[in-house]
């Protein structure tokens, strides 16, 4: 699109919103700027401009990128300003699943405009900004708690605690570069597939170092990102929400020049177990990749769901079901690789064969079972003495934890040499490139929110 002039559609004359169709690193996108007078306070016309911008992106099938700094609805306009925000929110919802929507917080963003962040596919926050629905004054009135703006809704908090921020950056220039890179992995809209690029990293490059990263013992810790870096192009990972729910890694990458979404248990954080935040993180990422036609590659090394009264009381059942729901309805190419342990319900929801993946691979070190050998023996043979339990554990491992047994039973397609992981994944993605699934028409699914 180089050489095509920008098209300014709405200026900020008398308001806080401007938008245009612009070139962003070779991609035509609808760019919205929410700022301007009165610290970006939204008046009724601003809400209408936001709605028109979202509608333009949807109708023209172009990604929607919003830069926001807003103090909320203009109080002197009365309830009409809130009505305008509602109109905008409805149009942003209509963009969901149609075009990629990326928000960048460039300054303080509060009240209704902050809620728009929750409607975005990806959120970038400049490090010295903050965002919240109810401000520090309201918190003090209702709870008596004294908080700073940063303490209540700073970029660091949203990156590590709430999960609202997928990325934080130093400034607007870094945000522009990051957004351009994110868009390079994505199509313009849901009816396109992501465009690949030439790859100088050979797809048949051996990866013997990958197996060396994973400890021989089932309980040894390691950073799964080191394994991912071994198998993707040039070792490059772009990891949204890297600081939130660190027990599950999600990342954009490419294999053989083909953009993919990666999901992986992280053994160095709570043994790679799934808790509420990890389930939310994984489900949202899987759903995002599915709607924008990014193939999914899942790397499994988990001992199950994280146990505890607090999680059960907060709804672990509902949130764990989100992972199952997201994978089960995904129609993009799906390849799963078990690196080491894969136990219990978490084994099933991490895109197992029974969630409907296309190709199921395993390393020779894989252990696929209801639980680990030691725990199983303690339940099945409670009366056994210590010496007997050692033999029983060994027998259980040989009989049930062997990946070749899983392959014989159809739970695994192939047990692969770790040194061939990159080439095996590249070959699988090539075979699945033409995959298309028809989905029965229905109004919409009822996601377990």
Give a label for each model feature.
Residues 1-449:
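Ligand-binding clefts of soluble mixed alpha/beta catalytic domains
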């Amino acid at each position: 699109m180089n050489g095509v002039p920008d098209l300014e559609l709405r200026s900020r004359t008398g308001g806080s919103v401007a938008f245009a169709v612009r070139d962003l690193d070779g991609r035509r996108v609808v760019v919205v700027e929410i700022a301007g007078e009165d610290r970006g306070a939204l008046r009724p016309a601003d809400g209408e401009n936001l709605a028109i911008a979202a509608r333009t992106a949807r109708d023209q099938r172009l990604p929607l990128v919003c830069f926001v700094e807003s103090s909320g609805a203009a109080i002197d306009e009365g309830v009409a300003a809130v009505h305008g925000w509602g109109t905008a929110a409805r149009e942003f919802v209509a963009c969901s699943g149609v075009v990629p929507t990326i928000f960048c917080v460039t300054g303080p963003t509060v009240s209704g405009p902050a809620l728009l962040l929750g409607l975005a596919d990806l959120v970038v926050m400049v490090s010295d900004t903050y965002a919240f629905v109810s401000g520090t004054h309201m918190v003090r009135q209702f709870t008596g708690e004294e908080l700073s703006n940063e303490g209540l809704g700073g970029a660091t908090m949203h990156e590590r605690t709430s999960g609202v921020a997928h990325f934080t950056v130093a400034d607007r220039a870094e945000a522009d570069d990051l957004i351009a890179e994110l868009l390079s992995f994505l199509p313009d809209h849901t009816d396109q597939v992501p465009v690949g690029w030439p790859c100088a990293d050979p797809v048949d490059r051996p990866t013997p170092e990958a197996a060396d990263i994973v400890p021989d013992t089932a309980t040894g810790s390691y950073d799964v990102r080191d394994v991912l870096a071994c198998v993707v192009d040039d070792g490059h990972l772009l990891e949204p929400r890297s600081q939130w729910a660190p027990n599950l890694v999600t990342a954009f990458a490419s294999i053989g020049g083909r953009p993919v979404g990666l999901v992986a248990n992280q053994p160095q954080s709570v043994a790679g177990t799934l808790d509420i935040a990890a389930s939310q993180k994984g489900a949202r990422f899987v759903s995002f990749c599915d709607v924008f036609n990014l193939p999914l590659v899942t790397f499994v090394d988990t001992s199950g769901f994280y146990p505890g009264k607090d999680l059960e009381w907060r709804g672990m059942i509902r949130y764990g079901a989100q992972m199952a729901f997201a994978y089960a309805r995904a129609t993009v190419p799906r390849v799963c690789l078990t690196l080491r342990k894969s136990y219990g319900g978490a084994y099933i929801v991490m895109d197992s064969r029974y969630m409907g993946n296309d190709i199921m691979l395993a390393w020779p070190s894989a252990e696929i079972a209801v639980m680990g050998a030691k725990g199983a023996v303690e339940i099945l043979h409670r009366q056994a003495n210590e010496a007997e339990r050692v033999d029983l554990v060994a027998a259980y491992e040989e009989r049930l934890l062997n990946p070749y047994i899983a392959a014989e039973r159809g739970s695994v397609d192939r047990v692969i040499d770790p040194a061939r992981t990159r080439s095996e994944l590249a070959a699988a993605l090539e075979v699945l490139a033409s995959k298309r699934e028809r989905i029965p028409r229905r109004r919409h699914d009822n996601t377990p929110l």
